[in-house]
Amino acid sequence: MQNSHMDEYRNSSNGSTGNSSEVVVEHPTDFSTEIMNVTEMEQSPDDSPNVNASTEETEMASAVDLPVTLTETEANFPPEYEKFWKTVENNPQDFTGWVYLLQYVEQENHLMAARKAFDRFFIHYPYCYGYWKKYADLEKRHDNIKPSDEVYRRGLQAIPLSVDLWIHYINFLKETLDPGDPETNNTIRGTFEHAVLAAGTDFRSDRLWEMYINWENEQGNLREVTAIYDRILGIPTQLYSHHFQRFKEHVQNNLPRDLLTGEQFIQLRRELASVNGHSGDDGPPGDDLPSGIEDITDPAKLITEIENMRHRIIEIHQEMFNYNEHEVSKRWTFEEGIKRPYFHVKPLEKAQLKNWKEYLEFEIENGTHERVVVLFERCVISCALYEEFWIKYAKYMENHSIEGVRHVFSRACTIHLPKKPMVHMLWAAFEEQQGNINEARNILKTFEECVLGLAMVRLRRVSLERRHGNLEEAEHLLQDAIKNAKSNNESSFYAVKLARHLFKIQKNLPKSRKVLLEAIERDKENTKLYLNLLEMEYSGDLKQNEENILNCFDKAVHGSLPIKMRITFSQRKVEFLEDFGSDVNKLLNAYDEHQTLLKEQDSLKRKAENGSEEPEEKKAHTEDTTSSSTQMIDGDLQANQAVYNYSAWYQYNYQNPWNYGQYYPPPPT
């Protein structure tokens, strides 16, 4: 009997609905879908028993759900409203500006101004549960009960794990629903069920469970109370021991037949009769066993029977409690490390971030899928502005639910992290994996329009088009990047990318050469352009490309590069003619030209020694350039790959998992 109860507990500790005289256990087929439904409010109070919104309510919900833009009404807004509004309109990430705006509209008690402010605020910060409460209270103060109810529903859709918001909403229902309406209790019970489904597995959800138990006690529904305890005693929570103590009081203070369903009561009596060897008049076995204990006429036996049943009920739940206590002990240290379980724009301490990472790893390794998802949901409230946790969440969901992955990415990118590139790029990559090429294309395009100038995003768009055979579009994207570049360096960077695309992918050497030559005309001091042009020419028929290669060398040697770089290119020109040249005269001329450059360098050195040294700033820049470029040129140019760091176009100091730090790796030494 003990083992069967324990197995039942492990499989269904959180499944009882508590809505009937018997314990009904339901198992969602896919908790990924279940929690997704909760966060989308498909499991909203709207679906509670006997809660049917009228057409008027639906229209009001739509009106409240959208930002209010009533031009005529805005003329009558409070005098300082426009000042506060402009601050957040110009910078929606100014959280302090939002706080001042919301405080102002609350003080002014201007409903339309408040609606506009709150509606816009929640587009950016839906996890601020306290402001949902303020908004709902504001509507209620104006006797707008239906809009107030709708605000609560929207808040619970945005943050379904908020125990506080659920409690506030249930209290709101208790205050506003008609106690004389026979459907009121069903509505409240249905809301309690949605609350514990969404937030009941939170380690700090004890107040919600206590509230549910107390309410059922007030209604005199002792069997419902027992059903709730059957669930909470199997969930690791902060006050797990307190719940067990209250459960024992519940059992001791009430008769077993009032605590259990008829089926449970009969099963328990049979078990006790079997253990005690009862037969005949003491306890008719089999189907003839009565549902009550009225057949026991001896008061002493009656008391003994009741106490035995109470003892057995507690014994069964003691085993559940012991198992749960073990689960709590494994998580206690992690839970103590969570100092800020709610959302805030201020950065979290490193210790708390580390604690979240370790807690998630522990739960992934040891917990059920349901517990992992709930912990992730808790984590992305506290760490909503840290894309690493959203990415980790999405990666975890890949093995459980494709729609779940999409749901996580969508929430992260469209609400909490609209300007973080990595999570958008991973979302696009995920959609591409699923064959949703247009969706991947739109994600990258939309993000690039939101955050301009990120090379990593433009290159991802190019590679997406290339992978799917849209070579002209890939070329167009690079040409557009060159055209709209903010500097010569940026333009040259994209020119190299375009040239290599044309040469390696489209096999169009003349067009590739033209791109680099035009780039050199714009940016004559950029060593990387010459290197890439040479590498490209070296990749073809050297005899056929001899003139083009020599022209490239001449551009570098006679151009505006530092003397040290010009000498290096000159030396490589001599080596090229020595190894592959067809005209000895060109070789001799190149040698003479090289000697002239060496003399020029000696002359500059003597001037520097005599006090005519070039400005320190320019010298530092020159040495920087020549040092890095010389390293690239040393060795076989055919193997050389031009290094080009474009971290200047990466904002936010992102570490790039695709190692975009260089154009091409340098040759092995």
UniProtKB/Swiss-Prot annotation:
Q: Cross-referenced InterPro entries, in alphabetical order?
A: HAT, TPR-like_helical_dom_sf
- The answer, when asked if Metal-binding is one of the entry's keywords, is no
Q: Which gene encodes it?
A: PRPF39
**PANTHER family with a match to the protein in the record:** PRE-MRNA PROCESSING PROTEIN PRP39-RELATED, PRE-MRNA-PROCESSING FACTOR 39
Give me the stretches of Low complexity compositional bias. Answer: 11-23
Location of region: Disordered: 1-23, 599-634
User: Which stretches are annotated as coiled coil?
Assistant: none
Sorted alphabetically, the keyword list is:
mRNA processing, mRNA splicing, Nucleus, Phosphoprotein, Repeat
Which of the residues bear the PTM Phosphoserine?
Answer: 44
Ranges of the HAT repeats in the UniProt entry: 109-141, 143-175, 183-218, 220-253, 333-365, 367-399, 404-436
Query: Where in the sequence is the signal peptide annotated?
Result: none
What protein name is recorded for this chain? Pre-mRNA-processing factor 39
Which SUPFAM superfamilies does the entry link to?
TPR-like
Annotated Polar residues bias: 625-634
Which family is this sequence assigned to? Belongs to the PRP39 family.
Which subcellular locations apply to this protein? Nucleus
Identify one Gene Ontology CC term for this UniProt entry.
commitment complex
For bias type Basic and acidic residues, the affected ranges are 1-10, 599-624
Q: Ribonucleoprotein: present as a keyword of the record?
A: no
Superkingdom to which the source organism belongs = Eukaryota
Source species of the chain: Homo sapiens
